[in-house]
C-alpha cells in the first residue's frame, strides 16, 4: 500500500467539466426566495385559511378572557373583570326567606273566605302601602293574608312586589321575608322524599307481548286502566263513571307484577309503584301520612296510576289481638280506604293492587267503589305454557324445530316463573356440554330437574286454596 503522501498521484484525473473554479461562492437566499419556498406546493386558498385560523384563535382567546375561563391561582377572575356594583345589587335583591303557611285570606272589604276572623292577631299587622299587583280587582289588591310561622307567631301581612294574588291560596306553604314578613314566593306542597322516589321515571321495557298465558287478564286490565284514560268520552256518553280500582290476585309467579310493568310501559300517565311493606312505619301516624302525601302527589298529576304490590302487608282484615301490635297497620289501612273512596273525590287516579292472599284482605277495602274489578291470575293452560316458552326462548340460541307443545305437556300445573327457570336450566345444560345452541334434549333435562326435582319446594298448590 503506498504511503499517505503518495495518494494524490494515484487519483483519477478530473475532466474539465468536473473542475470547479476557486472563485465560486455560496449565495444566500433572499426573503423573496424564502417566501417562494414556503408557498411551494400550497393550495390556492392556503393563505386565506391560515388567516382565518389565526382570527378564530384570537376570538377564542378574547372569549375566554371575558368569560373568566383562565383564572388566577386563587380561583378568582382577574380584577379588571370584577363587577362589584352588580354583585351588591344582586345580593340586595335576593334574601333568604322563611317558610310559613297561609291560614286565611282577608278580603279588602273586611270579609274572609271563612265565617270568622282572628281578631287576636290584628295587632301584629304589618301592611305594605306600596303594594303592586297585576290583578285589577280592588279587593284582591287590598287583601291581607294571615300566615303562621311555626313556633313563632301568627301575622297579618301583604304580598311582595313579585307575587300575584291569584298565586296564593289558603292552606298553602309560602316563603316570607325575614324582616317585614311579606309573602315573596308561593311554595309547592311538602311531600316526603321517600314518597317522591316511588314515582317510576323510566318506563320498563316489558310490553303486553312479553306476557304469556294471560290473554283474558290483560284484556280486563286494559279495560279498567287504559280505556278510561284513552277514551273517556265512551263512559261520558253512557253516563257512567269508569272503574278506578282493580285487584290482581293469584299464586306467586303467574304474572301479576309483570302485567303492571307492561301497563307502565303502555300508558303515558304517571306511574307510582308502592310496596306494601314500605307503608309499615315505626312511629304512630307515619304510614297514614305517607298514604296521604302519596295521593296528594298523585292529584297534582294530569293522570296517575298507583300500583300497590303485596297489599296484604297493610290491607289485612282488622282484629284485636289484645296487645295492640297491629294498630298502626290498621290506621294505615283506614287512611288508604278513606283516600280511595272517602269524602274527597279521588280524581283521575287509577289504583292497582296485587296480592297472593286475597282471603286476608279487609272487606272494606274490597267493596265496589274502592276496588271495582278483581282479576284472577290462574295457572296457564297448555297454549299459554307453549307461548311462555316461545317468549323466553326468543332471546336464546336454540335449535330449530323444538316441539314446545310436547315440552308444555310435561309441565302441568306450572307457573310462568317455573317455565322461565326451565329455559335457564336448559341453557346451563348447553354450557356444560360446551355448545352454543340449546337443543330439545336440554329442555327435557331441564323439565325433569325443575318441574320434577323441585316439586317439593313448590307452594302453588297451597296458594291455590287461598284464591
Curated annotation (Swiss-Prot):
GO terms for biological process: positive regulation of protein catabolic process; positive regulation of RNA polymerase II transcription preinitiation complex assembly; proteasome regulatory particle assembly; proteasome-mediated ubiquitin-dependent protein catabolic process; ubiquitin-dependent protein catabolic process. It comes from the Eukaryota. The keyword Phosphoprotein applies. InterPro entries: 26S_Proteasome_ATPase, AAA+_ATPase, AAA_lid_3, ATPase_AAA_core, ATPase_AAA_CS, NA-bd_OB-fold, P-loop_NTPase, PRS7-like_OB. The keyword Magnesium does not apply. Keywords: ATP-binding, Cytoplasm, Nucleotide-binding, Nucleus, Phosphoprotein, Proteasome. It is found in: Cytoplasm; Nucleus. One of its GO terms (cellular component) is cytoplasm. Transmembrane segments: none annotated. The modification Phosphoserine is found at residues 164, 231. GO terms for molecular function: ATP binding; ATP hydrolysis activity; proteasome-activating activity; ubiquitin protein ligase binding. Residues 1-26, 108-140 are annotated as: Disordered. The N-terminus is blocked. Interacts with UBR1 and CIC1. The 26S proteasome is involved in the ATP-dependent degradation of ubiquitinated proteins. The regulatory (or ATPase) complex confers ATP dependency and substrate specificity to the 26S complex. Present with 105 molecules/cell in log phase SD medium. Belongs to the AAA ATPase family. This is 26S proteasome regulatory subunit 7 homolog. It comes from Saccharomyces cerevisiae (strain ATCC 204508 / S288c).
